[in-house]
Amino acid sequence: MGIYDIFDDESARSISGMSIDEMAKKYGTPVIIYSRARIVSNIRRIREAYENRVRMLYSVKANDNPRIIEIMHQESIGSDSASPMEIMMSIFSGIPPEDILYSPNNASEYDLNFALDRGIAINFNTFTQYRKMREKPERISFRINPGFGMGEFAGTTTGGARTKFGIDPDAAILAYRKAREDGIREFGIHMMIGSNNRDHVKIAEAYSNFFRIADRIGREAGVSFQFADVGGGLGIPYVQGENELDIAALGSAVLKEFDRYHFGDLVLEPGRYLVGDAGIIVGTVNDVHNGFAGTDIGMNLNIRPALYGARHTIIPVGERVEGEKITVTGQICENTDRIGDTAWRLSEGDRIMVLDAGAYVYSMSSRYNGRPRPPEIMIMEDGKDVMIRRREDFSDFIATVV
């Protein structure tokens, strides 16, 4: 899984035979382009690594375009949803309620009962959330904070001290006991410790610790788990030199450890790993001055660099000529509106690409500074381009005004 794998060859001029430059001319810029073939390849790579013994739930937060969720459904993948709207997007895209796991945090009674009324299993972030329920669901899970976290950035580390996620193992024992006393008979257990992890040894160790903790919780609470959900967080490289996740080695190690226990299904919640490297942003350089390349790709579209300090590979469309390092910026009135640096020579009018933009880009975008969101285009396996979301216009800005 390399950062250029979405393209037909190292020239990075086409995807599935479709010219990137021609796509920019056809749809304008900025535009987000996805490869369906790449998404499917990523799905099947996980399946092969886990010997078809894993149940996958797509992390909708990574990219909530219904046409992408439809691909997941076509590939027999369920939904990991974090809000009522993600639940509705999943159902709209064909995923049945029984294949959805709702994992909210700080949920309102409305949020929780929304899932309950649709027969969707709830993964509770706290015991107090469970106690809010109007009625008790048939199936529940609790999110465990195992006492450790692991993520690319502090802001994407979701386990351990000083995080708002999950309950500690001792509290979980009491929570499962109470749920059992309430008559619930179907249980799962869940963990999510952080995002964009690429060290298969450390990931496998974290999963092993989770299985051990889950086994103790089950024994002491007197419940058996129909599934053990290790969450998502499987990472991809964003720039040259970053290591790739050895998914085959991870799958082998995890299955070996999982087989020591009796948890029912092993569940994964991949998002970034499935769609992250399957998307690119194509933009235009509008101005070059003082070491900055001013483009139409800003933090309104890709907030990750400003939010986390995340890096993306940025390359010209077409010929690449080495130059001095230049900082790529957008059109937003903030000095944090920086997408990253590149050493390729850029001139006014050039097309550029921001790679690995399939996850946490459009789904985290905004209309800040009155900038409409761009169209999203899917390139099919046969090379045909399909618009799966149009470019926004003024009517979208005032659609909710009353």
Curated annotation (Swiss-Prot):
Residue positions where N6-(pyridoxal phosphate)lysine is found in the record: 61
InterPro entries assigned: Ala_racemase/Decarboxylase_C, DAP_deCOOHase_LysA, De-COase2_C, De-COase2_N, Orn/DAP/Arg_de-COase, PLP-binding_barrel
EC numbers, comma separated: 4.1.1.20
> Could you state one GO biological process linked to this protein?
lysine biosynthetic process via diaminopimelate
The catalytic activity, as recorded, is: meso-2,6-diaminopimelate + H(+) = L-lysine + CO2
Q: Name one GO molecular function term.
A: pyridoxal phosphate binding
How it assembles, according to the record, is: Homodimer.
Q: Which family does it belong to?
A: Belongs to the Orn/Lys/Arg decarboxylase class-II family. LysA subfamily.
What is this protein's name? Diaminopimelate decarboxylase
